[in-house]
Amino acid sequence: MVLSVPVIALGATLGTATSILALCGVTCLCRHMHPKKGLLPRDREPDPEKARPGVLQAAQQFNIKKSTEPVQPRPLLKFPDIYGPRPAVTAPEVINYADYTLETTEESAAPASPQAQSDSRLKRQVTEELSIRPQNGVVEDVCVMETWNPEKAASWNQAPKLHFRLDYDQKKAELFVTSLEAVTSDHEGGCDCYIQGSVAVKTGSVEAQTALKKRQLHTTWEEGLALPLGEEELPTATLTLTLRTCDRFSRHSVIGELRLGLDGASVPLGAAQWGELKTTAKEPSAGAGEVLLSISYLPAANRLLVVLIKAKNLHSNQSKELLGKDVSVKVTLKHQAQKLKKKQTKRAKHKINPVWNEMIMFELPDDLLRASSVELEVLGQGEEGPSCELGHCSLGLHASGSERSHWEEMLKNPRRQIAMWHQLHL
């Protein structure tokens, strides 16, 4: 028998409704038998003492009592006693100033209570200072000097000394100066020093010098000096050892020199000894100022480069008349006594310290370099009239002092710019 669709739908609906009703009945029966197990924690009856405040819970009322009794503040913290070092009081005789006395700014007060004593101890650590008050009411500068050292003070006035040893080689016909040491009273920062030795005989003189060393109170050279000298010229020869300095501007100065006779009586050969250098008093310069220039030689191109940098302390009899006028430098290249070529720098306004920064180039073969020289003339010229010479100097092996040493340094160091200051002569 085939059932129709409406009958099947009606049966399904009735079955579903019956199931729902049965489930509801079972649920009610369970709640009736166990009423507390089916409730959530928030649905249970809360303990009034342990109840948590909620949104639906009634606000709790507090009883507030007003009182007019004064409120006592908390007691201050009591720090333990601090025992710090007291300021060291320097005696007046140590400062060596009789008109001053040492006092402290601590105010004395009678302790009234233990609390006051504690406060005074704390205040002493902060407010106690050391002051110097004059007795006569006049405030002057007080200078506390370091402890006097007699040995150091004696070295200030001590003359420079030089240690050396002389030996003569008959086969090579040379005089050797070794074991070179120099002791000076002071040293200048940034300065180098070297020893220059020269032997003078009837036919001429020869020179040699050591390498530059950092100047110190005690300077030692590992190298020595070798001076060619014939054995027959030894009794009449005179050796001069000069201690020189060179600053960062390539300015050379003499600390002292020592002259020795090589006859064998005053200085024995083969014995090391100390000699005191004689310092000459510096006379006021009679020159017309100084000029700073650098020279270099390029062997591959056969070119001599002369760079005129600047001059300083230019003065002459006509300096007032030439003030504000033009100043230039004329450079002349000479081979022995013959003038090869001359060039002139640009003109600069006549000041005490004019600046040029100009390079002049000469073509010169390598075989003529040692016998050549460079002559400088500083010229001042007004708007009208001839130029006036303010000073001159000459560089070459024929010269002496810094002019000769500058040329020798150029020969030893090709392709290198070497700058030095040179004194101008009238």
Swiss-Prot record:
One of its GO terms (biological process) is vesicle-mediated transport. The keyword Thylakoid does not apply. GO terms for cellular component: cytoplasmic vesicle membrane; plasma membrane; transport vesicle. The keyword Zinc does not apply. It is found in: Cytoplasmic vesicle membrane. Coiled coil: none annotated. Residues 30-426 are cytoplasmic. Its main location: membrane. It holds the Pfam family C2. Residues 158-275, 287-422 form the C2 domain. The chain crosses the membrane at residues 7-29. It comes from the Eukaryota. It is a single-pass membrane protein. SUPFAM superfamilies: C2 domain (Calcium/lipid-binding domain, CaLB) (SSF49562). Residues 1-6 are vesicular. Keywords: Cytoplasmic vesicle, Membrane, Repeat, Transmembrane, Transmembrane helix. Expressed in brain, heart, spleen, lung and testis. The first C2 domain/C2A does not mediate Ca(2+)-dependent phospholipid binding. Interacts with NRXN1. May be involved in transport vesicle docking to the plasma membrane. Belongs to the synaptotagmin family. This is Synaptotagmin-13. The lineage of its organism: Eukaryota, Metazoa, Chordata, Craniata, Vertebrata. The gene is Syt13.
